[in-house]
Amino acid sequence: MKHLHDLPAWSKLWNHFDDSKTLHMREMFEQDPQRAERYWLQVGGLTLDYSKNRINDETMSLLFELAREAGVPERMRQMFHGEKINTTENRAVLHVALRNRTNSPIMVDGEDVMPKVNRVLQRMGEFAHEVRSGSWLGYTNQVITDVVNIGIGGSDLGPLTMCTALKPFGHPRLNMHFVSNVDGSQLRDVLSKVHPETTLFIIASKTFTTQETLTNALTAREWFLNHAGDEEAVAKHFAAVSTNRKAVAEFGIDIANMFEFWDWVGGRYSLWSAIGLPIMLYLGEENFIEMLNGAHLMDQHFINTPLERNLPVILALIGIWYINYYGGGSHVIAPYDQHLHRLPKFIQQLDMESNGKQVTLDGKAVGHETSPIIWGETGINGQHAFFQLLHQGTHITPIDLIASLEKRSNLPGHHEILLANVFAQAEAFMCGKTPDEVRAELKAQGMDEARIEELVPHKTFSGNRPTNLILMDKVNPRNMGSLIAMYEHKTFVQGIIWGINSFDQWGVELGKQLAKTILGELTGETEPQKHDSSTERLINLYLQTNRK
């Protein structure tokens, strides 16, 4: 395989970095009146302004050269054609098949997967229609008013993010709840708000053996049976998203209400599959299809557009520029829409679980940085929390500022204030404020010269802080589909360049394996095992505390 450090463009970019690292965006804008127009892209309902980055035409040309040398176009083609690019698990990676709206054949091991995809999608639609229309009744013949999704990781974050983001499109009768944490308090809080006669539980676990999910599911089942009293009633109030028919049936769920997905669908890429059942229940089949349409639009743009005008590719390459050359170890997601407040967490899992890898596809140490730490908060809240560090801290931290052009509420003045802040922050991060500008400002306030000089260093902003401004014409299912697909493909491209497998997650497994051993010790079911001295003391502390 090709190793990043051996690619000619990698070295060329280091030389270019040494020559260009002192350039300031403020000067680049002054010298180039066409800069904003040139570094601007529109795809469907999304607009990307990437002009406020530490790049010029030479930077982008070399980054595109790097992408080609790393085999990005070929790897993209392999994914869309169902080749097994998840090499450590010997699996195809085909979340794009789930939103293949042309219905053209996509082959895995000689079989077209589209008939299966369409069949599950049709069954989801029929089930959602029954629940939403009120024809699906609980064990006391009442309509469903609450849906509780029990899952973890991709079985939780994707549906939660979409249902929250698209709340204005949700069914007015349905209240959506999501349980992922096994600590007990989250499930207890949800159960205290719902009624067994009118609640539908969705248990989302591919194997139906995930410890956290099954623990919560069994507790929910016990709570339900304490009220219903009849195990046959479980079938009216529980559905499953799984592939384990036997375990689902043993749980008491009617197999007719089990919705499958496949091993070529990774958890963090699965909201388009049956894992998205809560989304379809809440938004309806038509809006779910619109979400798929938006993702398909981005897929087609991604696979058919030259790298130089390819939105996910450009975002990926700009990220590589900061991570691997500037040493930018984190990236902020700042949506300026309260309904998008779950988006940073979703992208955190997508990026960090995909690209938080230390070896290349052939098992060698990567020798360079991979995934940045992804973090964030709604933009307005972030301005009053961590934007101080972004403006005047010592780190270089790229920021995605995400907003909607169309108002989401009818409250006068609110959206204008919001967008004014988005645009102002992007400008402030880029321009900063020079010492001379600070002096002039303080002098106009009548401050004496000695005091001015004391304050100048504190009120100076270096600027040159990079941002991507991502605008949706409106927040709707179609644009949300495009937005999520954009980030999926960005993550994939970065993984290609780093030479890693973006579609496994072995780092999730080790702690889970050790937890099984320790659980037996905490419950007294197994004899104490050999651990390091710290872990042994922690186990003993727990046992002593709970003997009291």
Swiss-Prot record:
Top EC class, one word: isomerase
Listed GO biological process terms: gluconeogenesis; glucose 6-phosphate metabolic process; glycolytic process
Transmembrane segments: none
Pathway involvement of the protein, from the record: Carbohydrate biosynthesis; gluconeogenesis; Carbohydrate degradation; glycolysis; D-glyceraldehyde 3-phosphate and glycerone phosphate from D-glucose: step 2/4
E.C. number: 5.3.1.9
Cellular localisation: Cytoplasm
GO cellular component, as recorded: cytosol
Record carries keyword Translocase: no
UniProt-annotated catalytic positions: E353, H384, K512
Keywords, comma-separated and alphabetical: Cytoplasm, Gluconeogenesis, Glycolysis, Isomerase
InterPro entries assigned: G6P_Isomerase, G6P_Isomerase_C, Phosphoglucose_isomerase_CS, SIS_dom_sf, SIS_PGI_1, SIS_PGI_2
The organism's place on the tree of life at top rank: Bacteria
Reaction(s) this enzyme catalyzes, per UniProt: alpha-D-glucose 6-phosphate = beta-D-fructose 6-phosphate
UniProt key word Isomerase: yes
Gene Ontology molecular function: any one: monosaccharide binding
First-listed, main subcellular location of the protein, grouped into a coarse class: cytoplasm
Function: Catalyzes the reversible isomerization of glucose-6-phosphate to fructose-6-phosphate.
NCBIfam families assigned: PRK00179.1 (NF001211)
Protein family per UniProt: Belongs to the GPI family.
Name of the protein: Glucose-6-phosphate isomerase 1
Provenance organism: Neisseria gonorrhoeae (strain ATCC 700825 / FA 1090)
Gene that this sequence comes from: pgi1
